[in-house]
Amino acid sequence: MSFIRLHKDAAATWLSRLLPAAIFILVGLFSIMVIRDYGRESAAARQTLLEKGNVLIRALESGTRVGMGMRMHHAQQQTLLEEMAGQPGVLWFAVTDAQGVIITHSNPGMVGKSLYSPSEMHQLNPGPQERWRRVDVAANGETVPALEIYRQFQPLFGMRGHGMRGHGMARSANDDEPAKQTIFIAFDASELAATQAREWRNTLIVLSALAAVLLATLLAFFWHQRYQRSHRELLDAMKRKEKLVAMGHLAAGVAHEIRNPLSSIKGLAKYFAERTPAGGESHELAQVMAKEADRLNRVVSELLELVKPAHLTLQTVNLNDIITHSLNLVSQDAQSREIQLRFTANETLKRIQADPDRLTQVLLNLYLNAIHAIGRQGTISVEAKESGTDRVIITVTDSGKGIAPDQLEAIFTPYFTTKADGTGLGLAVVQNIIEQHGGAIKVKSIEGKGAVFTIWLPVIARQQD
């Protein structure tokens, strides 16, 4: 069953990683497709207008050519242009000379006026191929978007090779070449502008939806990772509590069985110490027996404290006062080892509900471990600050020898110690007290560069079971 459960957990882990990756790929592909398709509809509509403009220009050139062959005058060309300007979507037709002066126009009143200045005509640089640009023109008393198509007006192009000359056409100084003329046609681009706006709106909606899917996937992935991390922490806490319960039953029996003989051993050791001369070997052995009995009794007491839920006396406390008091308790020891204690009170720090004696015990354990890790000449820094609106953080940083990477995970395990004379229960008790407050404790360390213990405590504590 454990083998099957292991494979299920592994499959779920891989699936949780593959699904976001697959969604990222799909979102990327859809985004590329949407971006590539953007502008396709408006480009097709614009191409339709360009082709229509080309047909009308060629028709006007053809009509002009026929009229020239039949000796039609300029008035007939003007009439032809006015008739063609009645096509749906056409705003106006105009034929200008090289200086931008209107020769013929769909609006007869514009003939002889300047459509564009010579400098603007130079910038437009009309050639034999159609060109286009977006402009705003006045129509029916309002400004509308227009697509302006223009190129050189070449009514004589089809007559070359037939020995014919146009009548009524302007000539340049060189009589072999006609004066350059430019034909302009303006189409109503309102539908084109609406199509582009619709394309932009639809593209924006699709991209926003894809971005929302991507964001939802990222959030779901991080929430899943957070859930897995919380699940693992909960399982670890349950396993630790199960071990503590088992140890509690064992410790209760061991304490009862050990303490009674210890009391007898300690009493006999004191009896022999009083009956033997001071300085003698028997006297020293009796004192060693008494000290070892005290040490063993202390270990049993620490074990009982670890496995039994701590009874907290919660009250509103000022962390600045607790930290200052706990530092004063170790100041003499730190001063004798030339270790600096650094702490600056945070006057804006919220008061929290906690057991001041238990918190002092926690901090003392961390200070003493730091002093032991430093040895001589170092620094212990303590900082307290708020984390959001409902938690505070206490960090204890030392400049000691640090903790090896392979020891970090086991640092809070009962009976694990890096000290030759330690019991390995100090940090386990610290973790137990912090968790009873509803908080958490973590450690970071780089071997040779010290360690940082971080404690998270809720502002409003509720004793945990």
Swiss-Prot record:
EC code: 2.7.13.3
Query: Periplasmic topology: which positions?
Result: 36-202
Entry's localization field: Cell inner membrane
User: Which UniProt keywords are given for this protein, alphabetically ordered?
Assistant: ATP-binding, Cell inner membrane, Cell membrane, Kinase, Membrane, Nucleotide-binding, Phosphoprotein, Stress response, Transferase, Transmembrane, Transmembrane helix, Two-component regulatory system, Zinc
| PTMs per UniProt | Autophosphorylated.
Record GO terms (molecular function): ATP binding; phosphorelay sensor kinase activity
Identify the enzyme class.
Answer: transferase
Which residues point to the Cytoplasmic side? 1-14, 224-465
Q: Which residues carry this modification: Phosphohistidine?
A: H256
- Topology of the protein relative to the lipid bilayer: Multi-pass membrane protein
Q: Where are the transmembrane segments?
A: 15-35, 203-223
Question: What does this protein do, in the record's words?
Answer: Part of the Zra signaling pathway, an envelope stress response (ESR) system composed of the periplasmic accessory protein ZraP, the histidine kinase ZraS and the transcriptional regulator ZraR. The ZraPSR system contributes to antibiotic resistance and is important for membrane integrity in the presence of membrane-targeting biocides. ZraS is a member of the two-component regulatory system ZraS/ZraR. Functions as a membrane-associated sensor kinase that phosphorylates ZraR in response to high concentrations of Zn(2+) or Pb(2+) in the medium.
Stored NCBIfam families = PRK10364.1 (NF007688)
What name goes with this protein? Sensor histidine kinase ZraS
Question: What gene name does this entry carry?
Answer: zraS
